[in-house]
């Protein structure tokens, strides 16, 4: 544990890194101890097969949690999975978890859900821990002050076998967001604004620490949304120092410490903040009060614009490579420069994902949907982030609000965030989505994705086009 009294001022990232450093070679290559390993069906089959071939066991099965999420249908699960490859991956994870003694939530377990929803929900995610998963949005767990990031399949095998990971240390960037968010502006708008400011490569080589009064004011769900999309800004991970909100969220969770162990953990957790005077390699500041509801218009998360804006003209971009890229984006999205964002009609709406599939997100969407009706030209689906989120939403009657308004109420899973299950866009369909990526084909071949907050997605589903949620009645 870092002795902050005698050491030079240290960042939160540096503290967690130093507490988990096993060995550092002369070239800066490090061996890092991993506290928690989350596993899903897509990036794990080859890793488990590698263990089997080498005759190895999972080093720490008690520190490994597996769940099926990417490929599961969100409709009737009593029927066979329509995609044979997906069915094989799901079956493989069940068998691998059984063989290697790993805790596993299958598609019929109410604890099942998107991997980055269930980790915090179960108390598997804890402040000051190192967390990895074969999934790029592992940065979500940084909302609790955990150093969390995605890894590749070969690294999944390495962590399963050794509970360590070979890494090189990143640089520190602090993003400070101060001020009060205006009504209708959310955590999703904060992170989209940050990505719009730094670009999708601006965080490359960095771990981002989010700070400031606007970040502190966010709920844990909101903080998870911000940290979730750190990777879209190019960063390795995102962090928020834990506080009373984080502790209250975790206390009593099934896998969280209890009794004297909780007290001991709290003593450590309360040291997890960047010291006054700690060095950051880069600093960025945003004024929360100046942020509008944001919509992406192109095929990169950095293509952000205010709901009151218009589609930009690539001809105004001096850099030729960037201009050509944005011209391609406009053509793919089927948009014309100068079109008002509020004039863009949609065909589909998706509310869910590891970015915005938690209870707070569903409450925000239900508040918009109550007493309204989904536009006749729009298909809209609500996909809870986990079985427990679904259970809570139904206890609050949110499902009835959505169904009465014409939304489809689904089972938990990654769903339309990515085209790896039955929920996907048809060519040229346009979607208001609460997910994290708007790349070409992300939600389906030739599908067109606009990233927005849950309230904005619900409003667009009802209006049939994007609207300013601040004016919603």
Curated annotation (Swiss-Prot):
Classification via SUPFAM superfamilies: Aconitase iron-sulfur domain
Keyword terms of this UniProt record: 4Fe-4S, Amino-acid biosynthesis, Branched-chain amino acid biosynthesis, Iron, Iron-sulfur, Leucine biosynthesis, Lyase, Metal-binding
Cofactor comment: Binds 1 [4Fe-4S] cluster per subunit.
Reported cofactor(s): [4Fe-4S] cluster
Residues where [4Fe-4S] cluster binds: 354, 414, 417
Catalytic activity line of the entry: (2R,3S)-3-isopropylmalate = (2S)-2-isopropylmalate
UniProt key word Ubl conjugation: no
Pathway per the UniProt entry: Amino-acid biosynthesis; L-leucine biosynthesis; L-leucine from 3-methyl-2-oxobutanoate: step 2/4
GO biological process, alphabetically ordered: L-leucine biosynthetic process
Residues spanning the membrane: none
Catalytic EC class: lyase
Family annotation (InterPro entries): 3-IsopropMal_deHydase_lsu, Acnase/IPM_dHydase_lsu_aba_1/3, Acoase/IPM_deHydtase_lsu_aba, Aconitase_4Fe-4S_BS, Aconitase_4Fe-4S_dom, IPM_dehydratase_rel_enz, IPMI_cat
Keyword match Flavoprotein: no
GO molecular function: 3-isopropylmalate dehydratase activity; 4 iron, 4 sulfur cluster binding; metal ion binding
E.C. number: 4.2.1.33
Family that this chain belongs to: Belongs to the aconitase/IPM isomerase family. LeuC type 1 subfamily.
Subunit structure, as described in the record: Heterodimer of LeuC and LeuD.
Function description: Catalyzes the isomerization between 2-isopropylmalate and 3-isopropylmalate, via the formation of 2-isopropylmaleate.
Protein name: 3-isopropylmalate dehydratase large subunit
Organism of origin: Rhodopseudomonas palustris (strain BisB18)
Gene: leuC
């Amino acid at each position: 544990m870092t002795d902050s009294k005698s050491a030079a001022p240290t960042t939160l990232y540096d503290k967690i890194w130093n507490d988990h450093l096993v060995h550092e070679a002369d070239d800066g290559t490090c061996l890092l101890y991993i506290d928690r390993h989350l596993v899903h069906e897509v990036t794990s089959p080859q890793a488990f097969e590698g263990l089997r071939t080498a005759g190895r066991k999972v080093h720490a099965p008690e520190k490994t949690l597996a769940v099926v999420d990417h490929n599961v249908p969100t409709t009737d699960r009593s029927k066979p999975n329509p995609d044979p490859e997906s069915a094989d991956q799901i079956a493989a994870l069940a068998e691998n978890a059984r063989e290697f003694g790993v805790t596993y939530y299958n598609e019929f377990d109410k604890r099942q859900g998107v991997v980055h929803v269930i980790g915090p929900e179960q108390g598997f995610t804890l402040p000051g821990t190192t967390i990895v998963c074969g999934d790029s949005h592992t940065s979500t767990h940084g909302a609790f002050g955990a150093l969390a990031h995605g890894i590749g399949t070969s690294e999944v095998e390495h962590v399963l076998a050794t509970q360590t990971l070979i890494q090189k240390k990143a640089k520190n960037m602090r993003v400070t967001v101060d001020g009060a968010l205006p009504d209708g502006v959310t955590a999703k708008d904060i992170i989209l604004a940050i990505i719009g400011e730094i670009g999708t490569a601006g965080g490359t080589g960095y771990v981002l620490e989010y700070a400031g009064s606007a970040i502190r004011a966010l709920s844990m769900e909101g903080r998870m949304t911000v940290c979730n999309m750190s990777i879209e800004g190019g960063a390795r991970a995102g962090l928020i120092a834990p506080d009373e909100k984080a502790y209250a969220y975790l206390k009593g969770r099934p896998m969280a410490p209890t009794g004297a162990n909780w007290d001991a953990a709290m003593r450590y957790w309360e040291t997890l903040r960047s010291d006054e005077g700690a060095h950051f390699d880069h600093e960025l500041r945003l004024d929360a009060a100046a942020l509008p509801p944001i919509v992406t218009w192109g095929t990169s998360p950095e293509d952000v614009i205010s709901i009151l804006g218009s589609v930009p003209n690539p001809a105004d971009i001096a850099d030729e490579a960037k201009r050509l890229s944005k011209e391609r984006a406009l053509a793919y999205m089927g948009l014309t420069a100068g079109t008002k964002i509020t004039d863009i009609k949609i065909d589909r709406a998706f509310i869910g994902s590891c970015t915005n599939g938690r209870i707070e997100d569903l409450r925000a969407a239900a508040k918009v949907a109550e007493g309204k009706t989904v536009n006749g030209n729009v298909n809209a689906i609500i996909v809870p982030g986990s079985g427990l989120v679904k259970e809570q939403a139904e206890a609050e009657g949110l499902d009835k609000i959505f169904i009465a308004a014409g939304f489809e109420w689904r089972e938990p899973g990654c769903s339309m965030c990515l085209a790896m299950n039955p929920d996907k866009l048809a060519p040229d369909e346009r979607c208001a989505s609460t997910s994290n990526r708007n790349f070409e084909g992300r939600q389906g071949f030739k599908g067109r994705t606009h990233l927005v907050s849950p309230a904005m997605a619900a409003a667009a589903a009802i209006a049939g086009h994007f609207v300013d949620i601040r004016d919603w009645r």
